[in-house]
Amino acid sequence: MNRLQHIRGHIVSADKHINMSATLLSPLSTHVLNIAQGVPGANMTIVLHRLDPVSSAWNILTTGITNDDGRCPGLITKENFIAGVYKMRFETGKYWDALGETCFYPYVEIVFTITNTSQHYHVPLLLSRFSYSTYRGS
């Protein structure tokens, strides 16, 4: 290993540590896994919404892009994380297009209810071109 590779290893490790810290600080996290190819779902756009209980309108809270590990650190701050109904929209069609593939689902929306804001909620997305699955992780 030459000196530049050694230095790069420290920088990449630091970046992963920073991203993991941001993930741990956010009370809501996700992880996209491309189960068809056995790789993380990198570079996928995710839009986080919260339902307004009065108007029944979906309000966009944030937009992010998954990193090389398929994660989207810092989706929401603890201050903005209140009880309510949330929706994560994953732009799966654009993801598969970028890989030169077609898919059946142009996007995936996962709607869930938050009641206890002191807990951490993990909402992973496992997907292939023709199916997807999710669950509530910790």
Swiss-Prot record:
Pfam family, one: Transthyretin
Reactions listed under catalytic activity: 5-hydroxyisourate + H2O = 5-hydroxy-2-oxo-4-ureido-2,5-dihydro-1H-imidazole-5-carboxylate + H(+)
Cell compartment(s), UniProt: Peroxisome
EC code(s) of this entry: 3.5.2.17
Gene: urah
Pathway: Purine metabolism; urate degradation; (S)-allantoin from urate: step 2/3
Database matches in SMART domains: TR_THY
Organism listed in the record: Danio rerio (Zebrafish)
Other known facts: HIU hydrolysis also occurs spontaneously, but more slowly.
Enzyme class: hydrolase
GO biological process: purine nucleobase metabolic process; urate catabolic process
GO CC annotation terms, alphabetical: peroxisome
Subunit (UniProt): Homotetramer.
GO MF entries: hydrolase activity, acting on carbon-nitrogen (but not peptide) bonds, in linear amides; hydroxyisourate hydrolase activity
Segments forming a coiled coil: none
Protein name in the entry: 5-hydroxyisourate hydrolase
Ligand binding (substrate): 31, 71, 135
